[in-house]
Design a protein with these regions (language model features):
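A generic secondary-structure signal
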Residues: 40, 68, 91-92, 145-149
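Conserved phosphate-coordination/catalytic loops
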Residues: 32, 80-84, 137
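Aromatic (often tryptophan-rich) hydrophobic motifs at membrane interfaces
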Residues: 98-188
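A mid-sequence, solvent-exposed acidic-amphipathic segment
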Residues: 56, 62, 66-125
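Acyltransferase donor/substrate-recognition loop-hinge adjacent to the catalytic core
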Residues: 2-76
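Short secondary-structure capping/turn micro-motifs that flank functional sites
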Residues: 58, 188-189
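Short loop/helix-cap segments at secondary-structure boundaries that form the rim of catalytic
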Residues: 1-2, 172
Length: 189
């Protein structure tokens, strides 16, 4: 219906789709720098960190981590909306059996967490991932360990959109998506 609708591509809303096994193993030349970050994390913190599934008693610490993470970020509607969405998920966690939340503790302090759920039997969706940016390799570690532990058998991972945030876009592209799931808006003429 090209005469009736205008079609507008929404690049900022495209979802990033990845091969899950590549993110779990970080194997291959494309993932060399990510594997180096992960190995650096393991060398520095290997005997001081613990990955585990988070429970409701951990959620206040996760919110504090989000707040620490956001301290040096420009406040905008995306950050406010994300925090409200995370709080809502945490409040309703007992009614969301498909939702998985995992975190990395270093010296008993929560320094990274991620949460997601299954879109279908083959695809996990990662909604939120936060980590202390001062800790080298922590993002690579939470990405890898969360998938290994919570979604060990999915074939694909959807890490959602970048909202037009340049740093987020670069981070998502650095994990070499196999596809961008395009999104469009239709406007009636």
């Amino acid at each position: 219906y090209p005469k009736r609708f205008e079609v507008i591509e929404e690049r900022d809303a495209h979802d990033y789709l990845y091969e899950a096994e590549k993110l779990r193993t970080l194997s291959g030349r494309k993932y060399h720098s990510k594997k180096n970050h992960f190995n650096g994390f393991m060398k520095e913190y290997g005997n001081r960190f613990l990955y585990r599934e988070l429970t409701q008693k951990d959620f206040p610490e996760a919110i504090k981590l989000m707040d620490r993470w956001a301290e040096d970020k420009e406040k905008d509607q995306n950050l406010v909306g994300e925090r409200l969405a995370v709080e809502k998920v945490f409040r309703n966690y007992s009614r969301l059996p498909e939702t998985k939340v995992g975190g990395i503790f270093i010296d008993d302090v929560l320094e990274a967490f991620s949460f997601g759920d299954l879109l279908n039997p083959d695809t996990a969706v990662i909604h939120v991932e936060k980590a202390n940016p001062e800790i080298r390799g922590l993002y690579a570690a939470i990405n890898k360990l969360f998938l290994e532990n919570e979604f060990p058998s999915v074939e694909f991972v959807n890490r959602e959109e970048d909202l037009g945030i340049e740093g987020l876009r670069q981070a998502k592209l650095s994990y070499k998506p196999i596809k961008l799931v395009e999104k469009y808006t239709l406007i009636e003429k």
